[in-house]
Amino acid sequence: MATSMGLLLLLLLLLTQPGAGTGADTEAVVCVGTACYTAHSGKLSAAEAQNHCNQNGGNLATVKSKEEAQHVQRVLAQLLRREAALTARMSKFWIGLQREKGKCLDPSLPLKGFSWVGGGEDTPYSNWHKELRNSCISKRCVSLLLDLSQPLLPSRLPKWSEGPCGSPGSPGSNIEGFVCKFSFKGMCRPLALGGPGQVTYTTPFQTTSSSLEAVPFASAANVACGEGDKDETQSHYFLCKEKAPDVFDWGSSGPLCVSPKYGCNFNNGGCHQDCFEGGDGSFLCGCRPGFRLLDDLVTCASRNPCSSSPCRGGATCVLGPHGKNYTCRCPQGYQLDSSQLDCVDVDECQDSPCAQECVNTPGGFRCECWVGYEPGGPGEGACQDVDECALGRSPCAQGCTNTDGSFHCSCEEGYVLAGEDGTQCQDVDECVGPGGPLCDSLCFNTQGSFHCGCLPGWVLAPNGVSCTMGPVSLGPPSGPPDEEDKGEKEGSTVPRAATASPTRGPEGTPKATPTTSRPSLSSDAPITSAPLKMLAPSGSPGVWREPSIHHATAASGPQEPAGGDSSVATQNNDGTDGQKLLLFYILGTVVAILLLLALALGLLVYRKRRAKREEKKEKKPQNAADSYSWVPERAESRAMENQYSPTPGTDC
């Protein structure tokens, strides 16, 4: 007996040692089922709060069901009754729901991508305060939001609020504390006192209390009997132990602190149900019909072992033979865990029951098809290919080819695939291809094709690509050429050294650029669509006409000139003379234009100089002498005569 008492005292000393994380004190505790919840006040970050719970053997609290949310609300209500009035009207208390840095929001899940720090399976229960922000760049933590201006009612459970997790010294806005959770194998009933006394429980998570509804396994109880007189005080020490599977008690027999002075009048003698007094002041505990007295001689238990609901979660209690024992049974899709009291989900997808994709769900599973497949109908396979190229469904601009589980797009000749998803078609500009223009002279790009053309005085060869010198006439043709002229025109050839090879400019217009002539394309030149209608060169040489444009066609080979050798020589001489005559007319026209320009320029210079002289003359400054003029000079004798000659008829 002394050895047992020594071990109990040693256990009490170990349990009462102060733990790490003393930045917050346990203010309230609620134990129910197989878990205890503790509420703490203190402005700590989420990491500091988790460290405090963890060093005492627990984690920040989980809230996986409405029932568990009510337990957490009860312990917070106890804390608020003991705590002084908080300054903030809206207060927050950390719980164990967090999302790590780099993990993004998932709106399709009840927990939105968050997870419980204590582990375990996610449940569909959630109680978010508002829509969450999609942020992946920092760690986010969840707290319970309490409106202290309103009473805590079971119908108004605390909302979940997510935000930054805080740091030491800066826990976050309105953070007032946190809630811890500690899980146990089972619970003992509170010790019953049959007389005056006090019981103090010390839990494994270093909480002391005298008013626990259930006492967790491995807790110690210190019972002090008496009414306060030290001479009459007696102490008893007990430990909550597991007597049998899922059976926990203190190992005591009968009520504690019993006194003949009170009998059954004090706390019903400490009996669970009935108390029967003897004639000498003693009493005994009894049970009602359908119940039996347990070994502690105080507690009553139903004769039906399932009446105490030993099975947890979704497990159902099933009586054994003669009703003396029981087993727990799980619904379909679940199986018993290692304790044989609770149920866990069966992962049916491990057996690969689906043709393609299997998604495990609580209590079951569902089959899904890969992208590009859809569920088949009756009599068809589980998943069948989706024909993306079907009428009205094709995503391609032109050609669409369906494949098993996918598709690919194609374009007609003259187009290439374009767009981010490769479903659009873009025209190929053959006139600016990497190999240079396909035409010898002018090139015109069209949607899906191109056309070739020639400068005035040149005609498109039968291959639709090269240009040959056209016939030259001194005057406009009087009528359509006869068959012989046509033959000569088609058969004439002109050797080319360095000619102007026009190509398409950046605006899509033909642009002539000097290039070295090259031989005409062979008979395997590309064949293009219908030619663009344009006027053939006609009229006097040296005058610009609309280029002769034809579409490139396949030529059967080099054409033989009609007639014999003499015909070929004649045609060559005619072509040379025509070319010289054309050059003569061009040079003459250029010289005439230059002479006219020189004459106009000389006339313009002359008129400008004359205008300047007149303007200078008009602006010449005047002086005083300009107002006088010289008198005509007379002979001196004539003047003397006029002055001294006597007047006629006088002596003077």
From Swiss-Prot:
It is found in: Cell membrane. N- and O-glycosylated. Disulfide bonds join 141-165, 264-275, 271-285, 287-300, 306-317, 311-328, 330-343, 349-358, 354-367, 369-383, 389-400, 396-409, 411-425, 431-443, 439-452, 454-467. Keywords: Cell adhesion, Cell membrane, Disulfide bond, EGF-like domain, Glycoprotein, Host-virus interaction, Lectin, Membrane, Phosphoprotein, Receptor, Repeat, Signal, Transmembrane, Transmembrane helix. InterPro entries: C-type_lectin-like, C-type_lectin-like/link_sf, C-type_lectin_domain, cEGF, CTDL_fold, EGF-like_Ca-bd_dom, EGF-like_dom, EGF-type_Asp/Asn_hydroxyl_site. The modification Phosphoserine is found at residue 627. Residues 472-546, 553-572, 611-652 are annotated as: Disordered. Its main location: membrane. It holds the Pfam family Lectin_C. The chain crosses the membrane at residues 581-601. Residues 612-621 have a biased composition (Basic and acidic residues). Highly expressed in endothelial cells, platelets, cells of myeloid origin, such as monocytes and neutrophils. Not expressed in cells of lymphoid origin. SUPFAM superfamilies: C-type lectin-like, EGF/Laminin, Growth factor receptor domain. Residues 32-174 form the C-type lectin domain. One of its GO terms (molecular function) is complement component C1q complex binding. CDD domains: CLECT_thrombomodulin_like, EGF_CA. Residues 512-526, 640-652 have a biased composition (Polar residues). PANTHER family: C-TYPE LECTIN DOMAIN FAMILY 14 MEMBER A PRECURSOR-RELATED, CHONDROLECTIN VARIANT CHODLFDELTAE. Cell surface receptor that plays a role in various physiological processes including inflammation, phagocytosis, and cell adhesion. Plays a role in phagocytosis and enhances the uptake of apoptotic cells and immune complexes by acting as a receptor for defense collagens including surfactant protein A/SFTPA1, C1q, and mannose-binding lectin (MBL2). Plays a role in the regulation of endothelial cell function and adhesion by activating angiogenesis. This is Complement component C1q receptor. It comes from Homo sapiens (Human).
